[in-house]
Amino acid sequence: MTEAIINEGSPLGYSQGYSEDIDAIRQREYPMLSDTTYLDHAGTTLYAKSLIDSFSRDLTTNLFGNPHSLSASSQRTTQRVDDIRLRALRFFNADPEHFDLVFVANATSAIKLVADALRDSAHGFWYGYHVDAHTSLVGARELAQAGSRCFTTDEEVEAWIAQLDADRTGAAQLFAFPAQSNMNGRRLPLRWCGRIRDRTKETATTYTLLDAASLVATSPLDLSDVSAASDFTVLSFYKIFGFPDLGALIVRKSAGHIFAQRRFFGGGTVDMVLTQDTQWHAKKRSVHEILEDGTLPFHNIIALDSALDTHARLYGSMGNVSTHTRFLARTLYDRLAALRHFNGERVVHFYMGRSPDFADASAQGPILAFNLRSSQGGWIGKSEVERLASVKSLQIRSGTLCNPGGTASQLGWSGADMLRHFSAGLRCGDDHDVMDGRPTGILRVSLGAMSNLRDVEAFVAFVEEFYVEKTPNVCSVVPSAADDSLQAGFYVESLAVYPIKSCGAFKVPDGQRWEIRREGLAWDREWCLVHQGTGAALNQKRYPRMALIRPHIDLARGVLRVVCGEASSEQKTLEISLRREDASLVTTSLCQNAAKPSTVCGDQVVVQVYSSTAVSSFFSTFLDVPCTLARFPPQSTTRYTRRSLHSRSSTAALRRQRPVEESSMPGSFPSDTPLSRTPEPPPILLANESPILLISRSSVNRLNETIKASAKKAVAADVFRANIVVAENLPHQLANTERPYIEDRWESFTVGPDRLQFDVLGSCQRCQMVCIDQCSGERRDEPFSTLAKTRKVGSQIVFGRHAAVADGVDGISRTVMVGDVVRPWYPE
């Protein structure tokens, strides 16, 4: 449908008024979009190539000095800043007789300036804000000494305005609301500002603050009617132009007196300062002069000049952008709303309030908020959708979208619900997608000036390919063999240890028995690389070159030998002692104060950091990231298997059912029923979720058959980063009868001649990290794309099984070896 629209030419509203066809603009101005679909313009839009070229020419042609000096270069800067300030006011039709513009870092900084000023007034202030407010608007309530109120509906606001008293005295009042919800694009009534002023008169102390950051990204803001305009308007220019990173506070001059009580002053905001016998200072007069502390970000302000020029040349006006983006949003909304599963159930559940009217510029902006549902009504996890979208080069946003009130309201969560979720571990930005049967966040798609119909088509095609169920899911059944002698056994095909978390594997040599501990294979994930600035553990998702860091465990010499990149005669090697108490730790310099906190998979973990510059330089140079090596402390009990997996393992601890001869259903998944008793979960070191990860060669083979059927390249088993790979020991006559995914039915298994017992804890949820080639460090879209179609359980994409050594096996040998026999057990 969309392709037909493209081929027919530009429909009414599509890039209307632009300097040329939008596809031509994109090809020339936005080369960064050549291999990606960008749908997060509400976060930031994109800068044009010619904007950067123009700004670069400006900087290399002109000499700009600090504007606080009187030199020629400084005066040039001052003149340009003054001109651009006026130009920015005119961009919003704001008469400089009635408005002043203060340059700030972003909209949040502008909000804080207003809230700080009212806090410093004699009686403080009362604060009211709309439920659809951005987090930064909500945060201002903490400064309101006279109290605050969240208005949960437009009707509540109207009722409050109706009872405002023009003669009230005491603390000032500030009412803040977004011109457009950054969550779903709903546009709120701008008439509120004028109505509040009419009710309270000019002499009253009730002010309005308009968060215009989301609105102005794709729509004109007209401040020409002074009587109807807000007292304070905040915005960020990068939302409009992509660059520069700069914000503005537009102040209605009649309200500028609130800043007179501001105590702090910075360089450039005063005419004189006395510091010795008398402590006195004289402030400058204009609003922007007393608020712009210190040296302005004058290069960013100068860049705004190029941004205004470029935007006008390419798009003509903000009105053109508004028409173009609302047409695209309407098209996308209609296409998504039409998607149905095989049984007629809707695929997309929108959070758009009343039916969005994209034709009405005062009602709806080009933002869509929604979640996806299965044919049975189950919620598809937002994190899983965003991960898969990233693999397919689609950039979207998920979560609470920095709009806590609007999101909670749309999802039906009360404050008590949210507190309960927080106590259960829910945090902003995590992957707790569904709690108590309801989503914890929302998916957001937003369009911008340079979006086109192909962006719309790409996202619709993505949802159709991966989330529209065209037929019921059917699990295949492997028939049980009539002759038990023909049944396949299993054996350990390979063992892999990952000494440094998220780095390459050390393959245990054939014929060598390897110790296995409660925490997993010996030396597995005992080290990690931590960012020297944040303390967070690095991972391949962000730094795929970590796959090329290849450790080797030399037990004979007692060292961990690390090599980076491809082998060469000049390649350097780092050796770390395996012994914690070894004297060599002095040279590799284990941190003298022993421990510092680090973040691993959301957990706060105490690690021991190597402070040697040689160690940090070795890894930092290769990854081009400031990092160093850290080790999990001995006898630490700070990390355990994830609770969701541990609850499943309780069943296996009590039930040991039939061995491999039992017929099974690969492709289906056992129901994990937690027991009432909860023994201590298995400990882990720096692994993500469990001590051991197991995969099956037969399952990898089946997955690759599916991948190759789509004319794509098969993947190696090592992309799954398993500790144990098991294979079927098939008799010759059953060579073509592998049983892929049979491990999904395993409840427990034994390994080796001593039958070392393992409990299966659950299936391994996969992310886009499996798309990193472990030999080259390159990203691909497989196998995650195929897994998303063939291995989805509810909202999770799974492959492989988590396991741990069973309780009560201390009396037997805890070793495994390549070639050991594996005997699985199945539930009844």
Curated annotation (Swiss-Prot):
Q: Which cofactor does it need?
A: pyridoxal 5'-phosphate
GO terms, molecular function: lyase activity; molybdenum cofactor sulfurtransferase activity; molybdenum ion binding; pyridoxal phosphate binding
Q: Which residues form the MOSC domain?
A: 652-825
**Residue positions, PTM N6-(pyridoxal phosphate)lysine:** 239
* PROSITE patterns according to UniProt: MOSC (PS51340)
In UniProt terms, what function does this protein have? Sulfurates the molybdenum cofactor. Sulfation of molybdenum is essential for xanthine dehydrogenase (XDH) and aldehyde oxidase (ADO) enzymes in which molybdenum cofactor is liganded by 1 oxygen and 1 sulfur atom in active form.
What is the name of the protein in this document? Molybdenum cofactor sulfurase
Species of origin reads Aspergillus terreus (strain NIH 2624 / FGSC A1156)
Which gene carries the instructions for this protein? hxB
